[in-house]
Amino acid sequence: MYVLGFLYIHKIYMRLILSCFLLFTILSFGQLNKPISLEFNYLKGNILPHKKGLDHLITGHPEGVMLSVLKQSDGSKEWQKDYNYPEYGAYFLYQDFKNDILGQNYAAGFQSNFYFLKRNIQFKVASGIAMTTHPYDKETNSKNNAFGSKFMANINIGLAYKTYFFNKKIAAQTGFFFSHYSNGRTKSPNSGINTINLNIGLAYNLSTSKINKKDSVVTSIENSKEPIHYNVVVRSGLNESSVVNSGQHSFYHIGFFANKKLNKKTTLQLGTELFLSNFYKDFIKYQSIAYPNKQIDANTDYKRVGVFIGYELFFDKVAVEAQAGYYVYQPFKFDIPIYDRIGIKYYFNKK
């Protein structure tokens, strides 16, 4: 029985271990003069029922492991000191949803760890590409309304308490871990899956370099004297309505916004945008025919106009952007009038 258990674990995690070893080799080769650590976390939790129609997918407690290879910033850039010497690197995540319809997910991407309170509180952000073993299939897996495609985006956020041993060579940590999987409506169905987990983990410092430690996490940030900037943005891509196999259509989102940089870390935004999502044209016609009791006019305008506020957090030339908006013009009221957007931007010019 013990042999069978070992073979089962070996089969599931072999690809994970080999992939992480490759990531470790790429990141750490020739760089052991700087603090490099290998981090392991075990996860177990629950699927969040964030939408209706997911009850049949919640049959157990998902569990998984996350392996990361991380390098601590050395303070060579000013922003690294401002953020208390964060870690950055790569991660590999495996999650078993304990459900025959969902199967398992593998994900890999980039990770950053930020520290507070003498590096005892860790805030983790990781984002990458995920692959599911059980995507939607009309013939073999028609009940999977969460993953309409084999590949999708993966976003992870964690908060943990970390304590150090043996001259900071080894650390133990425990906390909460949130994971999100979605293909961004590029292919239906796409309810996506969110899990909230408890995690326990270990980290091992592979180098002999000391860990940079800031005396205080509170820094004085000088207010920016930059003027208000005005911007035009055009976004485009492909997406699909919630009707399975209805086909992908192009979309064009045209926005105008003003932004004011408050300091070297933060910027506020205020703007408006026009949404031209072409899949809505066919979707409105479909709804008018399929649900005559709703009395939907097939010629209803598919366009939408929104107003939004936004926030940018800068890490040198990279900025994390978050926006929340409200549709002030939405003739076809299928979605709720509130929307949000999260993204990453890179500035080629100096800010």
Placement of each model-derived feature along the sequence:
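Outer-membrane beta-barrel translocator/channel fold
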Residues: 36-55, 72, 76-82, 117, ...
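Outer-membrane beta-barrel strand-turn architecture
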Residues: 32, 73-75, 116-118, 163-167, ...
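Short glycine/proline- and aromatic-enriched beta-strand/turn motifs that initiate or cap beta-hairpins
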Residues: 31-77, 213-259
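Outer-envelope beta-barrel architecture signal
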Residues: 32-38, 82-88, 119-123, 168-172, ...
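Transmembrane beta-strands of outer-membrane beta-barrel pores
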Residues: 42-48, 71-73, 92-98, 127-133, ...
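Residues on the lipid-exposed face of transmembrane beta-strands in outer-membrane beta-barrel proteins
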Residues: 40, 67-71, 108-114, 125-129, ...
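Predominantly the C-terminal beta-signal and adjacent terminal strand-loop region
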Residues: 160-207, 219-225, 335, 339-351
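Residues that define the transmembrane beta-barrel architecture of outer-membrane proteins
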Residues: 34, 59-65, 84, 102-108, ...
